[in-house]
Amino acid sequence: MEKEVDKKFVWVIKDLNVFYPKQSHSDPFLIAGSRWRLLALPKGTNYEFFYQYMGVADSCQSLTSSWRRHVKLRLTIVNGISHKRSIVTDSDLYFDENLPACSYPTVPPPFNLLARDAGFLICREITIVIEVVSLEVIGTSNNDGANSIDLLKQTQQIIDVNGFQVLPSQVESVKRIFEIYPNIASEVPSMKPCLKTLYMNVLLGIIETLCQLPAELSDTDLDEASIAVLFVSQGGFKVDWLEKKLKEVKEKKKNVDNGKARLQQIEEDLQKLNQKRLDLKDILDKEKANDLTANVPLSFNDVLKMF
């Protein structure tokens, strides 16, 4: 029986074999009347996670008239040591009546997912939380038999840019990418639109990360960006330029961190010098007071005074 997702769906992957990962999947869950589940597919000694769309639920067959959904899901790979180390990924998914069963890859998990000291694998279990961030209904039921492609053109919620379906807010960024790197997707193999959209969202997410101040980026942010670049590259995108930019940002981050360390050392040295200055001033004031006390002439009576 599918679970209707209100805010969160928790999947605990149990009895994981670190040396021989095996494919597994969550129980089905419902989002906006559609059936989904999460797949964990082994890749080497790690896992890749996929959202799998499984069609309209039996109890919601009224959705089979022309309709389209846009749902934003947040996947969190929980870290048992520190919440700050948890891996959080947002994905924009689009599905409609005519879309067959389709798997949407998420950003690959951290390289140390199964490491004993990383905090993700606790008692041979990994916990994944799926949250519905937003849900948008694009179009409504009608009787004219209009298919989802016509409905998409009418609502203009998604725009095609060089074969990629993107949101209106992403159009200028995607166009700019293709203007500067027209061959970026020339070797991308034929794939379903949902997968192409996922890859483009990951690419835009990497660029957004690199546009932040180096001082605001953590090492984890940059590690995740490296994994994401590899993910996009494996999808057939030519992202040598992005790898160079990532390397450049990492170098800037290193320089900023080193600069912070030097500044901190200088501030500590300055604080010590200031304290030494204050200590010397106290000594100087005491010496001046002693000097004033000693530098007093004897009076006539003082000279005549007997001991």
UniProtKB/Swiss-Prot annotation:
The entry's keywords: Coiled coil
Highest rank taxon of the organism: Eukaryota
Coiled coil: 238-290
Classification via PANTHER family: MATH DOMAIN-CONTAINING PROTEIN, TRAF-LIKE SUPERFAMILY PROTEIN
SS bond partners: none
InterPro entries associated with the record: MATH-CC_domain_protein, MATH/TRAF_dom, TRAF-like
PROSITE patterns per record: MATH (PS50144)
Gene3D superfamilies attached to this UniProt entry: Apoptosis, Tumor Necrosis Factor Receptor Associated Protein 2, Chain A
UniProt KW Coiled coil keyword: yes
Signal peptide: none
Name listed for the protein in its UniProt record: MATH domain and coiled-coil domain-containing protein At3g58380
Cited CDD domains: MATH
Residues in MATH domain copies: 6-132
Keyword Coiled coil: yes
